[in-house]
């Protein structure tokens, strides 16, 4: 057997990922032997991050027994990261939930009762009573839902439809608010449309990669393997990595830059200044395709209105901007000189110049990648806008090998949270609830009365916590996330509301997470291939999978829960008389009848499917629910730049990147010859904007909401590690991954540890103004903070790092800044 170069790279990438985690790859991933004939294989996208790797799932006797990279998947080309190889084991933790659990005392629900098994009928009875009471006494604003970028497309669509049209409440938001909201607002402000214009195929054609606040080596390892291949294949290819601390991605970097927290804004403006001063502006592109605007400043930090920082802000929450000339923009960025930038960021001048030269060189095709370092930022929208500026000044955009690319952290943060519109302000296909025309489009398509969808933006994630604490939000359904562990400022703003006797909290989850154990009712949920699903990844690729096994016990999919619960409400119980008068034929009908059993949704018969293609929900309802929901949803985007292919095409493909027009997917948007919406002769057209032009924004540096001082003298940054995903509710139940990284640690500079009489392995108390945790000192290893900063992962339920974090958000995106708050350390 000959080992090809590709095989060599692939084998080494697998080995590297496994070695990094301190474990070996499962045998089935190396070579599926022995019982191979008895295993049934089918395709699915990976359950974890937003990369969207394709895997082959092996099932036998009703269980997932094997998993391997799908060699026909264009994203990963047969390679998995170490989490992907252990996918089968995430479903079989010993504490998997299999029946509803309600807090009960003396035979009935009680806020302080013990969790007791109940039937679905009993669970829904209690939920129904709580929902109806709140709706009757306080109205739709008293109920809410916190959803997920891990929802399938039709689960998110059903949830949004049920809440916004059925319950008439926009108080539904996804956990993608915590990770991708800044990217969404950044895209909308600059381009008028959401999501990247490029794709992963850019990697093999780029000359330079710049990572802004993104540790791709651990968080997007498959894409990192492709970047590594590209970098090692051509000595002229360069990699720059920017972060507030060193991590594994620095190992490949030609220019590894550690900067002072929040000063990335300074670096971005410096590069724009460098481009202009060195006559590197692509004048032809700039003149034809770009407008300039100056944004409002001093916009606050998304804290409560009574907070001193909010009271001091001149323009709290302002998204305003005004036109400006090129000369005015030139003068604006001219303040960000090399000397000033080096002083404010702590970055050596030669490194700053090297970075700027990558963008300024007209012969270098540059990709900018970023994730949470940019997005989880009190000026995250600005950071997104400022990196777009660099690509718009140079014209390095919407062409193979160059462009700005926001990487997602969840498997369907794009396909579900963003495209479906499960945010509190959004509707499908980039429409918003505040736009009367958009509401009208949805109401007519859904055949519900005009005025059903509220015009008021609902509560975003952090606002939901505050409303629960204040007693304004009283019934709260949490699905497919673990926000009690993942959200900020647990002690002050979340736990009080969850345990308030006025409130009733439902958590749908496969496992007894921190969130589930803090709730009043736990609903057991089907996972991954226990249901039919669809995800949309970071490169606009929509991928489907079939249900391949049944969920254990009485566990049900989120879709089943939403649809079945809708049967409990008649239109008269949720809609005012003025709405019913418009459509009297809807009187007496349930929300199930009006939203999910409509002719549009129920028109696809099960006779279209083979026996092995049926799923549990469709069997129970008698029609192909998933297809009906998808086709109804896809209508919104077709002909409007968000075109999705017909439903059946996705089951036959390894994903398709929208817009899909006349059967052809789109790799690069907004450019002639690549995007079907750009006509011959237009060159580029940013058609999300009325005039087809993108916007360069002039936005300054503004400080973080909280910085170290004499008492709390260290920056805290939080994040993830390779072996665990988010709060670890799945990966910590995989023995091999748990052993590889069993508990969270505090990564700290050796000199900072020495100054506090701390040694590696010591127990340490980490305290902020909001709370404290006990952890373990780590002065070596993969993450190497500079002096003055510590880093902690948030996967460990025994170390709730978000007891420490501040609930400051970007005022425009409402996304939390998990990367910057002040802490102190004390030896235990």
Swiss-Prot record:
User: Which keywords label this protein?
Assistant: 4Fe-4S, Electron transport, Iron, Iron-sulfur, Metal-binding, Molybdenum, Nitrate assimilation, Oxidoreductase, Periplasm, Signal, Transport
Catalytic reaction equation(s): 2 Fe(II)-[cytochrome] + nitrate + 2 H(+) = 2 Fe(III)-[cytochrome] + nitrite + H2O
Its subcellular locations are: Periplasm
**Does this entry carry the keyword Nucleus?**
no
What modifications follow translation? Answer: Predicted to be exported by the Tat system. The position of the signal peptide cleavage has not been experimentally proven.
Q: Does the keyword Oxidoreductase apply?
A: yes
Query: Main localization of the protein?
Result: periplasm
Q: Which Pfam families match?
A: Molybdop_Fe4S4, Molybdopterin, Molydop_binding
Assembly and partners are described as: Component of the periplasmic nitrate reductase NapAB complex composed of NapA and NapB.
Q: Which NCBIfam families match?
A: NAPA (TIGR01706), PRK13532.1 (NF010055), TAT_signal_seq (TIGR01409)
Q: What is this protein called?
A: Periplasmic nitrate reductase
């Amino acid at each position: 057997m000959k080992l090809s170069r590709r095989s060599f790279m692939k084998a080494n990438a697998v080995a590297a990922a496994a070695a990094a985690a301190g474990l070996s790859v499962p045998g089935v991933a190396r070579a599926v032997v022995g019982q191979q004939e008895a295993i049934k294989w089918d395709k699915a996208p990976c359950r974890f991050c937003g990369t969207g790797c394709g895997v082959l799932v092996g099932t036998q006797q009703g269980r997932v027994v094997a998993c391997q990279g799908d060699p026909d998947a264009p994203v990963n080309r047969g390679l998995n990261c170490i989490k992907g190889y252990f996918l089968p084991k995430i479903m079989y933790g010993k504490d998997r939930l299999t029946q509803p659990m309600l807090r009960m005392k003396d035979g009935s629900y009680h806020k302080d009762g013990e969790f007791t098994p109940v039937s679905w009928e009993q669970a829904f009875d209690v939920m129904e009573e709580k929902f109806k009471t709140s709706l009757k006494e306080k109205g739709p604003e008293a109920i809410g839902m916190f959803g997920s970028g891990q929802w399938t497309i039709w689960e998110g669509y059903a949830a949004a439809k049920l809440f916004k049209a059925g319950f008439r409440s926009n108080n539904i938001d996804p956990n993608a608010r915590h990770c991708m909201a800044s990217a969404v607002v950044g895209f909308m402000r600059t381009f008028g449309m959401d999501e990247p214009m490029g794709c992963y195929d850019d990697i093999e054609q780029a000359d330079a990669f710049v990572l802004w606040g993104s540790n791709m080596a651990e968080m997007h390892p498959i894409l990192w393997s492709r970047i590594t291949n590209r970098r090692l294949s051509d000595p002229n290819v360069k990699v720059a990595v920017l972060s507030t601390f060193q991590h594994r991605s620095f190992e490949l970097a030609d220019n590894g830059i550690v900067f002072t927290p929040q000063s990335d804004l300074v670096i971005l403006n410096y590069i724009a200044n460098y481009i202009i001063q060195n006559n590197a502006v692509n004048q032809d592109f700039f003149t034809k395709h770009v407008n300039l605007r100056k944004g409002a400043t001093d916009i606050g930090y998304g804290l409560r209105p009574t907070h001193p920082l909010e009271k001091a802000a001149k323009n709290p929450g302002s998204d305003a901007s005004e036109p400006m000339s090129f000369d005015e923009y030139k003068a604006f960025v001219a303040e960000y000189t090399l000397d000033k930038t080096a002083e404010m960021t702590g970055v050596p001048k030669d490194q700053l110049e090297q970075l700027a030269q990558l963008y300024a060189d007209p012969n270098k095709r540059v990709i900018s990648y970023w994730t949470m370092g940019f997005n989880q930022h009190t000026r995250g929208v600005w950071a997104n806008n400022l990196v777009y500026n660099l690509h718009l000044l140079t014209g390095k955009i919407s062409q193979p090998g160059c462009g700005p690319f926001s990487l997602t952290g969840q498997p369907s943060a794009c396909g579900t949270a963003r495209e479906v519109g499960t945010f509190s302000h959004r509707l499908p296909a980039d429409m918003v609830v505040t736009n009367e025309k958009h509401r009208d489009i949805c109401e007519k398509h859904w055949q519900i009365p005009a005025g059903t969808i509220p015009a008021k933006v609902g509560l975003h994630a952090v606002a939901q916590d505050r409303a629960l604490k204040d007693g304004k939000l009283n019934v709260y359904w949490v699905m497919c996330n673990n926000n009690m562990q993942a959200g900020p400022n647990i002690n002050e703003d979340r736990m009080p509301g969850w345990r308030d006797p006025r409130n009733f909290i439902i958590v749908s989850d496969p496992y007894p997470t921190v969130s589930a154990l803090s709730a009043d009712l736990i609903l057991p949920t089907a996972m991954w291939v226990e249901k039919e699903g669809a995800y949309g990844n970071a490169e606009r690729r929509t991928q489907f999978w079939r249900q391949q096994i049944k969920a254990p016990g009485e566990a049900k999919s989120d879709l089943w829960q939403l649809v079945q619960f809708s049967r409990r409400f008649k239109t008269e119980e949720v809609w005012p008389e003025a709405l019913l008068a418009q459509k009297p034929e809807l009187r007496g009908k349930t929300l199930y009848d009006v939203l999910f059993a409509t002719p549009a949704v129920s028109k696809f018969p099960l006779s279209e499917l083979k026996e092995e293609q049926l799923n549990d929900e469709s069997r129970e309802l008698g029609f192909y629910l998933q297809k009906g929901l998808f086709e109804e949803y896809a209508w919104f985007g077709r002909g409007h730049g968000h075109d999705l292919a017909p439903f059946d095409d996705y089951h036959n493909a390894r994903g398709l990147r929208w817009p899909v027009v006349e059967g052809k997917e789109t790799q690069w948007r907004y450019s002639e010859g690549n995007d079907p919406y750009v006509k011959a002769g237009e060159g580029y057209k940013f058609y999300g904007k009325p005039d087809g032009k993108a916007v360069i924004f002039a936005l300054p540096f503004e400080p973080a909401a909280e910085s170290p001082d004499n008492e709390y003298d260290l920056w805290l940054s939080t994040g993830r590690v390779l072996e665990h995903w988010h709060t670890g509710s799945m990966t910590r139940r995989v023995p091999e991954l748990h052993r590889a990284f069993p508990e969270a640690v505090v990564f700290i500079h050796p000199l900072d540890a020495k100054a506090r009489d701390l040694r590696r392995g010591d127990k340490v108390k980490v305290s902020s103004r909001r709370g404290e945790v006990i952890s373990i000192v780590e002065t070596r290893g993969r993450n190497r903070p500079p002096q003055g900063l510590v880093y902690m992962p948030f996967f460990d339920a025994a170390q709730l790092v978000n007891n420490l974090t501040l609930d400051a958000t970007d005022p425009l995106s409402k996304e939390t800044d998990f990367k910057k708050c002040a802490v102190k350390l004390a030896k235990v």
